[in-house]
Amino acid sequence: MHEMSITQNVVEICEKSAEGRRILAVVLEIGELSGVVPEAVEFCFEACTAGTLAEGARLAIDRVPGRGECGNCATVFPVRTYFDPCPACGAYGVRVVAGEELRVKELEVE
């Protein structure tokens, strides 16, 4: 489960940003195309924050839906996989414009 190491990295990023202050809440953005399972991150969060500035912090996850832009006709549409064709023209030259995110969106500290 790579979500454990991802969650450990998120906690490290939060601690650096908190500059020694206690972390009360963390909001993450996780894209549907990122390959990260939000439920697994939630499961790992408590274990990864034990003994850190984020121990006891609340975790909220904002899921970012996948969106693609057709390279042929410029239509922007929802995508669930990297191989979705354009619904307008059927082309497969789609550029992902949203849904790959994995970032700390907000951090609440004391």
Swiss-Prot record:
Originating organism: Geobacter sulfurreducens (strain ATCC 51573 / DSM 12127 / PCA)
Protein's recorded name: Hydrogenase maturation factor HypA
GO molecular function: nickel cation binding; zinc ion binding
Xref: PANTHER family: HYDROGENASE MATURATION FACTOR HYPA
SS bonds (residue pairs): none
Alphabetized HAMAP family for the sequence: HypA_HybF
Protein purpose: Involved in the maturation of [NiFe] hydrogenases. Required for nickel insertion into the metal center of the hydrogenase.
Pfam families: HypA
Stated family: Belongs to the HypA/HybF family.
Keywords, in A-Z order: Metal-binding, Nickel, Zinc
GO biological process: protein maturation; protein modification process
Binding site for Ni(2+): 2
Residues that bind Zn(2+): 70, 73, 86, 89
